[in-house]
């Protein structure tokens, strides 16, 4: 069990007002209709190509978290990722397009989450009436950069923009020399584009967890205790839920799990530790995180803030507001997560008829045998 100071805890709180945008993060930054796109690197660098990008929390987490903000009509052009890319819509309406020419689409609205497969072209446009906001989660600490659609690279060259082999943006209008052949990213050949896998809208819909798809259920062994009963709706992989009936719709390896946590007014998740780094992004204000066994360090989160909880630190999550809140929970790793509740919580839950089975899921206490044999 680790202990954290208030100063250390505050340094892991990236407030919404702390996010710093970059408008020259990608090679399409001068393309009309894309020039007003804002890129944010909140945890890790993401896939930015700009040396001007500010990274709020550069510490490695096993995944990257960023954001994109765009006025109505602005487009993020077609590109390929090598690791998982997950879009979490928090504000506005976005039309996501995929395919070699962006021929397929899905419209995302606040609360919707889309995981786009690797090695296919994808892009999106703000089709709403106001400025939109998308959080993104990328797999791995090193995402490998991106490959832009050949048309984008050809057009960028007309504006004096190139990408180096190490994913750095080269702007000849600022005095950067034109990179020679072998030193820059060349447009993908037609025959290579033709080999990319295609996904039908029906297949992609299985990689969407829309607001109406979410399956909220009581999630933890402390649900039998007063003031508890927090609910989780799985999105990707094996998360922190202790409910055996929870099954995430998106199950291929991403390098992280993702879930929605819902807390009613004054409701809490009792003190527990986790062996993995855990990031929370609330949709609404009111989440208070109390840290350490003594709960002597607290952090209050506003809407759309990002907070990173270190591994092996005791934490309590509580809704201090007077309306229900939803919080996105992202945890590193593809394995089943194992929250460890404090001993007094486990004992109180047992006395109220609930315990955990050997797989780490909630069960009725009177059904569990006292089986002490373990493999040597």
Question: Where would I find each of the regions flagged by the language model?
Answer:
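Conserved short histidine dyad/triad with adjacent acidic residue
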Residues: 46-53, 64-81, 241-246, 257-275, ...
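Double-stranded beta-helix
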Residues: 2-4, 121-199, 316-376
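Polyanion-binding and phosphate-handling cores
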Residues: 58-63, 76, 82-85, 104-127, ...
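Conserved metal-binding segment of the jelly-roll/cupin
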Residues: 70-72, 108-128, 139, 264, ...
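A short, N-terminal "cap"/entry segment at the start of jelly-roll beta-barrel domains
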Residues: 1-61, 163-254, 358-376
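A short beta-strand-loop-beta hairpin characteristic of the jelly-roll/cupin
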Residues: 75, 80-110, 120, 272-303, ...
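Beta-sheet entry/capping signal
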Residues: 85, 113, 133-134, 278-279, ...
